[in-house]
Amino acid sequence: MASLSPPDLGSVVHTAAEEADILMLQELVSIESLSRHESSAVAFLRGAMAARGFRVEQDAVGNAVGTIGSGERHIVLLGHIDTVTGHPPVKIEDGVLWGRGAVDAKGPLATFVAAASAAAADLKVKVTVVGAIGEEAIHSLGATEVANWPAPAFCIIGEPSGWDSLCLGYRGSLSLIYRLQTDMRHTAGPGESVAEQAVAFWNGVLAEVAARNEGAKNLFESIGPGLRSFNTSSDGLSETAELSIGLRLPPDLDVPELLQRVEALAGEGQITVDGMQEGYRTTKQSKLVPPFLRAIRDEGGTPRFKVKLGTSDMNVVGPNWKCPIAAYGPGDSSLDHTPEERIDLSEYLRAIRVLRNVLISFS
């Protein structure tokens, strides 16, 4: 890991514990951890948790796992340690930490570690923090492994909701590959080229989605189509078109029926499912909600509820565990995956205090 420049925290005076929490996040963000290349960050996180009194391990797929406290009830704080590509310089200026993962989602993950260790003396429950690998990849390998655990009493997903907000749901996703191969033809001859047929298929998908979205109350309840890539190739005898397609799915959508319709639109083309996560949503009546409302208000905030248009590991563990679940963490999610990714450290510290009080309330 590269040496870190001294942070510019502005005029704010922090306690020793707050400075340690800021340094932990800065160091974690400084370690590049693309999906499938998280081992260095996992090793750092395990060390940081061990230094704070966690019982640490690395599971079969490479997740960082740390447990603190004891009791009959088990609380899982499931964050992810991988990031998307791009590693802008890590710096702290005027109380703001810049760098890939500061928001999505090392900020929420560091919040989990800091809050659980701060609550340790008052815990009467077992709290497990997971720094999961592979969340930014299609198959969410880390969360898929964790989903095999016995269901906990509560689960909190580490994603940037904002310190004063709770996220109650995420759309799902369906990743598809469309492939069409035809015999070569002269461009002056009759008929459509393989590229033209692929375009016609994609336009058919857009029309199908538009028809299904009629009457949707909002974007969360609609299907979101995306064309990720379009490639054509030829070997002189045949020509091939391949499209990579992503569909964002609202909860309760009949995914097999939608897939059947897409396959019909493909005609002679082949459809391969490259990954699928169904949408998932909980309610304001969840037993997780009241402790967060109290803790946010105690910090001077006005609690808000959100649902997100993307996916998270809630989509993976929620259907398996069926326990009270929500996503929480500091940060502005509109900065996810952008060159401007950054987190206000005062918000980070506030989120730590909120989550600490939530964990103590379970005791």
Residue spans for each PLM region:
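Short beta-strand/turn micro-motifs at beta-sheet edges
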Residues: 87-88, 164-168, 230-235
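Acidic/His- and Gly-rich active-site-bordering loop/insert found
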Residues: 2-102, 123, 322
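Active-site nucleophile and cofactor-binding loops and adjacent substrate-binding regions
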Residues: 97-105, 304-310
